[in-house]
């Protein structure tokens, strides 16, 4: 151990003895992680084991709290009924207003991630990659020899933006003048209809039809067929006319399918005739009478016993949320929200990083272990965050990843030496390529960059300064004096919380030691 590295005495529990702990390669006060050396297997196991232990403790506390709420004990005041004003507002709005989200829902919401925008960007990226591939391969063959590639190129040149009109989103494009003229030419339509008829009455002996209707003929025909509107109107709107036409026809009346269709149409026509204004008014008056009768029954039931004692119990029912006015209710809700947010902040994990990396497997393990923490994790890079340490930096909560002004980061692809038989070397090389794809996927999810660009950057050692790290997406902000002050305040909350816990453990241990010494002296 280097000289000057501070060590602290720490109690892990009531049953385990207190021991000295090095704060630079271990977790300090259960919520601080110092990754300031080579990320070897021992350090990785220590960090990940205690991170999972933190997750299990937080999860057990949440389950205990939910069980207490289900049992009916210690219910909070927010679970009470709403006031009259809020009920009136909801009735006036017609129930269209959304439900108020709780604090936990706001903390765990995914609205800030922009999943739909990322999906659209991925679509554009894949579309661009495929188009570039087709353009590159166009020098080796002709599209006329491979008609399906021509059709694919036409499809990929479409604009799938959400601002585009639905009418302009055609199967094939009519942007060019040639396509527009082909669409306006009725000869193409007649050609399409004739070929479809020939396809229906296809015979094996006709050679001319085979030449016209080969495998790629639909693509050739659709390349010249670009309709402007596929929103076809429903042909069965007037059910009465269809019913009369089917009734007059005598050819297919003996078939069971036609009889069933006529019965369904007649039933629908009967139901449409029953929905007259007079009958609608009668049914609405009947429903309104039932509702009024139910309201009177509820009022009589409450007036007999509940309303008589409501005024007497109003002064003593201090947990009744409806009895409070608007200002007191807002202040109570604000205090509860602040307390919940403070509790969540006290559960956050802080990771300080200054490392040249280590094994890629250990870096992926630390990154995955940070995702277990529900309250989030704050990562701060000092000096260097290279190789596997950059995975730990990217594993923090998005928006709470910081780098100092002089920090440098580096990413590269996995490396390693292989020896053995040729088949074993080939199997190990395939596994390394899979790990390379996994690392690129982690960086892609953390930086919102396409995976093919990440793979291009991972080909060699890719060094980044502090600002380049932020632009790249591995970090979110430079740790200035103001940011460091806020980080110190958050860590002070965690330290004070765990300081009190450590003091209680040490006091209980000291009392147990004092009792044991007194019993030994009395026995002697």
From Swiss-Prot:
Residues 60-345 are annotated as: Insertion IS1. Residues 82-91 have a biased composition (Basic and acidic residues). Its EC number is 3.4.21.92. Gene3D superfamilies: 2-enoyl-CoA Hydratase, Chain A, domain 1. It is an enzyme of class 3 (hydrolase). It catalyses: Hydrolysis of proteins to small peptides in the presence of ATP and magnesium. alpha-casein is the usual test substrate. In the absence of ATP, only oligopeptides shorter than five residues are hydrolyzed (such as succinyl-Leu-Tyr-|-NHMec, and Leu-Tyr-Leu-|-Tyr-Trp, in which cleavage of the -Tyr-|-Leu- and -Tyr-|-Trp bonds also occurs). GO terms for cellular component: chloroplast stroma; endopeptidase Clp complex. Belongs to the peptidase S14 family. This is ATP-dependent Clp protease proteolytic subunit. The gene is clpP.
């Amino acid at each position: 151990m280097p000289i000057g590295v501070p060590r602290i005495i720490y109690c892990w529990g009531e049953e385990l003895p207190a021991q000295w702990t090095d704060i630079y390669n271990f977790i300090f006060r259960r919520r601080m992680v110092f990754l300031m050396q080579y990320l070897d297997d021992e350090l990785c196991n220590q960090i990940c084991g205690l991170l999972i232990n933190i997750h299990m403790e937080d999860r057990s506390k949440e389950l205990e709290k939910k069980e207490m709420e289900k049992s009916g004990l210690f219910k909070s005041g927010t679970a009470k009924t709403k006031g009259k004003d809020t009920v009136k507002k909801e009735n006036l709005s017609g129930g269209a207003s959304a439900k108020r989200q709780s604090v936990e829902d706001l903390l765990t919401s995914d609205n800030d991630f922009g999943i739909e925008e990322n999906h659209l960007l991925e679509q554009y990226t894949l579309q661009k990659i495929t188009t570039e591939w087709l353009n590159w391969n166009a020098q080796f063959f002709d599209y006329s020899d491979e008609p399906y590639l021509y059709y694919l190129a036409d499809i990929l040149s479409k604009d799938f933006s959400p601002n585009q009109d639905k009418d302009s989103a055609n199967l094939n494009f009519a942007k060019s003048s040639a396509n527009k003229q082909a669409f306006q030419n009725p000869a193409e339509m007649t050609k399409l209809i004739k070929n479809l008829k020939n396809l229906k009455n296809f015979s094996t002996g006709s050679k001319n039809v085979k030449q016209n209707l080969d495998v790629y003929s639909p693509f050739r025909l659709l390349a010249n067929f670009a309709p402007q509107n596929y929103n076809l109107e429903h042909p069965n709107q007037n059910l009465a006319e269809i019913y009369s036409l089917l009734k007059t026809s005598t050819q297919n009346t003996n078939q069971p399918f036609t009889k069933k269709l006529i019965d369904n149409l007649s039933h629908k026509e009967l139901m449409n005739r029953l929905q007259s204004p007079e009958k609608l008014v009668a049914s609405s008056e009947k429903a309104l009478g039932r509702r009024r009768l139910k309201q009177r029954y509820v009022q009589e039931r409450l007036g007999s016993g509940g309303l008589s004692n409501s005024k007497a119990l109003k002064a003593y029912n201090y947990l009744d949320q409806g009895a409070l006015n608007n200002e007191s209710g807002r202040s109570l809700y604000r205090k509860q929200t602040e307390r919940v947010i403070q509790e969540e902040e006290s559960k956050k994990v802080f990771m300080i990083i200054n490392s040249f990396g280590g094994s890629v497997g250990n870096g992926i393990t630390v990154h995955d272990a940070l995702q277990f923490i529900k309250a989030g994790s704050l990562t701060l890079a000092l000096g260097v965050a290279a190789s596997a340490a950059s995975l730990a930096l990217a594993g923090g909560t998005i928006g709470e990843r910081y780098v100092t002004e002089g920090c440098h980061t580096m990413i590269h692809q996995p490396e390693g030496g292989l020896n053995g038989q040729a088949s074993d070397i080939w199997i190990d090389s395939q596994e390394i390529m899979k790990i390379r794809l996994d690392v690129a996927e982690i960086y892609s999810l953390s930086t919102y960059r396409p995976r093919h660009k990440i793979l291009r950057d991972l080909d060699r050692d890719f060094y980044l300064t502090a600002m380049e790290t932020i632009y790249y997406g591995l970090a979110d902000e430079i740790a200035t004096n103001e940011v460091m002050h806020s980080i110190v305040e958050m860590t002070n909350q965690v330290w004070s919380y765990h300081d009190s816990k450590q003091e209680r453990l040490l006091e209980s241990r000291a009392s147990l030691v004092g009792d044991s010494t007194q019993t030994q002296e009395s026995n002697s």
